[in-house]
Structures are given as structure tokens and as C-alpha cells.
């Protein structure tokens, strides 16, 4: 059972964060809120999201799993006004989700959770560099880098504690360094890995809305991004595997 209302902006941020990587997901619902964890079809990236019941205007739920077709929900997002209140209600059969806003009422057929991939286990990674940067600065650097290349290196120097983003194309190059007040280190250590900009561009749309994004980085290891939204009542985590450089 699920019956809830939520502000349009929070609903939109929730859908955008998940749809950055996947078209469908298994949503876990209970009295504490909602959560999901899933990987993309190429097994290159993972997204996890939690949204507390307190982030909703009203929230009543019993433990259940919902199979969401994210693309269906995204298709209606342009119809939702910024000041709309979105109502969510699971029907008695558990096979349809009613989404209402601004005079519209959609009834969406849910996916059979048996057809959705099982939740992945979050890997326990040794990533020595942990730091925070403004979400908008990171996203701006990703957008700029994508104009010259399809890959980007993320690196930290233990000696200088400078975070460097470097994109090399066939003939052009973009480099962005964050130092001083723009980067806050929890642990400063040498780290460098190469990543696909296609994935980072998709993640960046949500990361760019966050005041701060925490980055955990190693050498030739996946990178982890985490940030909060909905006034700290929601959290998002991304994990992206590195691109292996040819010798």
C-alpha cells in the first residue's frame, strides 16, 4: 500500500536522479520512505536513492516492492507545474500507480518486479581520496569537457591537494582545477582514474543541483558520488566504473 503527496520539485529531482542511468527500477516502500538501488544495462554504473517519508507532504505506506517504468513517468514530467502537488496512490491490486497533479490523473501499469534485475550489492571499495566540491562547478566542468572529448580524467595530488579534471580530444584539451575554498578534503591522497563523459553528463544533471557533492576517488578504480536533496531528507549515490587506458 502506498498513498502519498509530494511537492513537484522533489518528485522531479527523484525521477531525474534515477533516470540518469536506468529506464526501470525496483522501488522499495515502507513506513520510513522509499529507496532503490540498481545498475545500468551495461553494468558500468550504479545508482542508489533514498527519500525519507518526512520529505513527503503526506505519506502512508505498508512494506511493498513496486516495479517502475521510469520512461513512462519521465514522459509526463513536462506536464507537471513547478507549484503542483503530486499525488501517488497504489491501487488495491498493486499493479497500477495513480499519479495526479494539476487536474491530470494518470494510471500507470507497473512492471512485474520478477522481471527486474535483483538489487546489486554495493561494493566495498578502497578509495583513498574523499572530498567535496560544489555540484554546479563539477557539472559545468563536465559539460565543458564533453565539447572536446568523450572521456575525462579525475585526479587528486596528495602533495598539493588540487583536484584536476582533464579532457583530451583529438586536437583540443580542457583542464579544470579546483583548489582552496572550492574543494574540501576529508582525506587528501594521490588518485587518478579515467571515465566516460557520456555517463558523467547524465549524472551531472542531478549533481549540478546539489550544493555539495562528495567524491571518493582511487587509481584505476570506480568513482563514487553522493549528495543530498529535498532539504537533506533525500540522498543519491552514483558509482561509475573507470575506462581502462590502452598501453
UniProtKB/Swiss-Prot annotation:
Annotated S-S bridges: none
Keywords: DNA replication, DNA-binding
Pfam family, one: PCNA_C
GO molecular function: DNA binding; DNA polymerase processivity factor activity
Swiss-Prot/TrEMBL GO biological process terms: leading strand elongation; regulation of DNA replication
InterPro entries: DNA_clamp_sf, Pr_cel_nuc_antig, Pr_cel_nuc_antig_C, Pr_cel_nuc_antig_N
Family, as annotated: Belongs to the PCNA family.
Alphabetized PANTHER family for the sequence: PROLIFERATING CELL NUCLEAR ANTIGEN
NCBIfam families given in the database record: PRK01115.1-5 (NF002222)
Subunit structure and binding partners: Homotrimer. The subunits circularize to form a toroid; DNA passes through its center. Replication factor C (RFC) is required to load the toroid on the DNA.
Functional summary from the UniProt entry: Sliding clamp subunit that acts as a moving platform for DNA processing. Responsible for tethering the catalytic subunit of DNA polymerase and other proteins to DNA during high-speed replication.
HAMAP family linked: DNApol_clamp_arch (MF_00317)
Protein name: DNA polymerase sliding clamp
Lineage: Archaea, Methanobacteriati, Methanobacteriota, Stenosarchaea group, Methanomicrobia
Gene: pcn
